[in-house]
Amino acid sequence: MDKKDNIILAFESSCDETSVAVVKNGNEILSNIVATQVASHQRFGGVVPEVASRHHIEQITYCIQDALDEANVDYEDLDAVAVTYGPGLVGALLVGVAAAKAIAFAHNLPLIPVNHMAGHIYAARFIGEIKFPALALLVSGGHTELVYMPEENKFQIIGETRDDAAGEAFDKVGRVMGMKYPSGKEIDELAKTGKDTFNFPRAMEKEDNFDFSFSGLKSAFINTVHHASQIGEKLDKADLATSFEQSVVDVLSSKTVKALGHFKVKQLILAGGVAANQGLRTRLDKELTAFKDVELLKAPLKLCGDNAAMIGAAGYVAFKHGVRADMTLNAEPSLEFEWMVEK
């Protein structure tokens, strides 16, 4: 390795993916090991925290060794250890934090605390350079946020969901339709074949703010399906999927466009698990044609879900800015972005 290179060992365990990665200079993936737990949670229709924690404990050591082996590096090649410490499930977070602290302590390496959502944003570094000021649309199972970044490693939430996250709504709607967890991809594929015939609500779309709400849409969808079931009416699943997805995409895109009109930025970053949705990606491509000076940077499809490579990218940025943690670092399940903004 070139001595000018920064090699970071990164950990991600905030929910139901155990992931360890080795990342060089914040933009090159040397390895990215992901042990998924989807099969274990499918029968419950969602993530069970206790089950997730146990799986992390079982897999973390194997993931560490696999990541080092695939990257062909040893501990002495590392410059730092980065770890997600929030937000997320507390038991799950603790596994990754404990492992990262142990390695940092044993090998006398700097420990870098990383906000999980910052990781999603910086996954875009694997596509290209992030230019500031920037706006990020973060859409996942647990969060839906518009984040303004005036400069590198500075974050300001300008809009967020008042209730359910968009990804959570996708999974609950999928369960009502009899789909397996997680159901976002299946809904997205089905939505390509249907029509928007149900006209589901677009909550808060016209309000003069950048916030979101998806609980009303979720309830309207569930009520529509249940009512049809009670009267023996058969609904077209493709039309249901299209109508639901269009409602979500309409709200996400309209709020993002509104934010772009208020904040002069160089880039719009689309990130998070729902960023893999083709309907949303296509809509933002279309909307950005009206903003000639704004570049759309979309997280790579394979890095939209939870993974440690994105934590390595965010960790590299934090490392450059002198962000460090000591051995008292603990999991913060309700961590927000404000801690990263200089007041």
Swiss-Prot record:
The keyword Transmembrane does not apply. Transmembrane segments: none annotated. The keyword Cytoplasm applies. Pfam families: TsaD. It comes from the Bacteria. Belongs to the KAE1 / TsaD family. This is tRNA N6-adenosine threonylcarbamoyltransferase. It comes from Ligilactobacillus salivarius (strain UCC118).
